Amino acid sequence: MNSFSNDDFDFSFLEEGFSARDIVEQKINEVSLSDDKDAFYVADFGDIVKKHVRWFKALPRVTPFYAVKCNDGKAIVKTLSILGAGFDCASKTEIQLVQSIGVSPERIIYANPCKQVSQIKYAASCGVEKMTFDSEVELMKVARNHPNAKLVLRIATDDSKAVCRLSVKFGATLKTSRLLLERAKELNVDIIGVSFHVGSGCTDPQTYVQAVSDARCVFDMGAELGFNMHLLDIGGGFPGSEDVKLKFEEITSVINPALDKYFPADSGVKIIAEPGRYYVASSFTLAVNIIAKKVMVNEQSGSDDEEDAANDKTLMYYVNDGVYGSFNCILFDHAHVKPVLTKKPKPDEKFYSSSIWGPTCDGLDRIVERFELPELQVGDWMLFENMGAYTVAAASTFNGFQRPTLYYVMSRPHWQLMHDIKEHGILPEVPDLSALHVSCAQESGMELAPAVCTAASINV
């Protein structure tokens, strides 16, 4: 767990003055004369390090337990383990992944309220004790199969203001919570805390206030029954990019006073959260290639002029990744993606109404329904930013189309910052590394050197 190794993943240092976007351009240039223009990702792990620093500035009392389901890349898990994060696992496989790199059981919460018996037994066998539940059936399953479990009661929230709602499936009401606590007492099961999740894409931060208040009620119920509850899990759903209605700090500015009111610092309660997309969404950029194109002329235009008819056309582009691959986020995560062109349009270039489709034989495989684009050609590239969350983790190989290749990069200052965090924790003052996103190459228009990154295999 103490080193990044090329045996684990291809990890490269960015040379000074270059950005992850430059690596995207370099990879495109490398295959420009080849027919093998496969889709690929470039992931900037420096962005993950910056997110970790930002987290503790905004939520200093809350320990992040990364939601592995969001993006289960081993490189991501390893990076976050070095930074000191915990892990929210939802299955035996995720627990195995996290423990395979040396993470201790104490840094894992099995945060799935509905677990298969064999997987409860597996958690018991490998020392994972913290796990969630929200029903009497689950309580009895755990009591029989994991006597040493430290249970966290998942309560329902008002997630009506969230894009991805979860309380329709998970969470106990306050009334049910008391009954579950009483039953746990009868079964001699240890209840150590409360968890909740307000849903992803929450647009009303006051939802957190009500959820924290409800959690306080359950803590008080537990105290009445003799439980020593000392863990509060405020869930996930925090935004991982800036193209959202409610920014991360707008949410945390509401959460912090609620935590101080209901769970003050001297209360003895440890507070954790389950961020997933927060850490990885903005670090991944996906590059796709146009593999086919269709021109649709509006036959109802009423014009006999060929030039007018050509100007009234719409364009359909087919690219080599789709909703059965990385863009499954459109179907399952309510994502709205926008293409970014690798070539800057000319000032007088005409734009056309365009749609973008994936490569499979399914008519459902549409990425963008309508977008104004200049006319592009087969072989041209499009980029999609903020593609790190709920994309590769749920991608399939339907129709035989393979998942995109992943390239991992990080700047040396971010690497050094990660090393410092590992050795000393989050420092009160950390260097401002925001300028590292500015690319000298892009600003100056210079051509990229043959290699703007070097391979890394460095102990930390």
Curated annotation (Swiss-Prot):
The record marks 197 as: Stacks against the aromatic ring of pyridoxal phosphate and stabilizes reaction intermediates. The active site is at 361 (proton donor). One of its GO terms (molecular function) is ornithine decarboxylase activity. Substrate binds at residues 332-333, 362. It catalyses: L-ornithine + H(+) = putrescine + CO2. InterPro entries: Ala_racemase/Decarboxylase_C, De-COase2_C, De-COase2_CS, De-COase2_N, De-COase2_pyr-phos_BS, Orn/DAP/Arg_de-COase, Orn_de-COase, PLP-binding_barrel. The modification Phosphoserine is found at residue 303. Its EC number is 4.1.1.17. Inhibited by antizymes (AZs) in response to polyamine levels. AZs inhibit the assembly of the functional homodimer by binding to ODC monomers and targeting them for ubiquitin-independent proteolytic destruction by the 26S proteasome. GO terms for biological process: putrescine biosynthetic process from arginine, via ornithine. Pyridoxal 5'-phosphate binds at residues 200, 237, 274-277, 390. It is an enzyme of class 4 (lyase). Keywords: Decarboxylase, Lyase, Phosphoprotein, Polyamine biosynthesis, Pyridoxal phosphate. GO terms for cellular component: cytoplasm. Pathway: Amine and polyamine biosynthesis; putrescine biosynthesis via L-ornithine pathway; putrescine from L-ornithine: step 1/1. Its cofactor is pyridoxal 5'-phosphate. Pfam families: Orn_Arg_deC_N (PF02784), Orn_DAP_Arg_deC (PF00278). The modification N6-(pyridoxal phosphate)lysine is found at residue 69. Belongs to the Orn/Lys/Arg decarboxylase class-II family. Catalyzes the first and rate-limiting step of polyamine biosynthesis that converts ornithine into putrescine, which is the precursor for the polyamines, spermidine and spermine. Polyamines are essential for cell proliferation and are implicated in cellular processes, ranging from DNA replication to apoptosis. Homodimer. Only the dimer is catalytically active, as the active sites are constructed of residues from both monomers. This is Ornithine decarboxylase 1. It comes from Xenopus laevis. The gene is odc1-a.
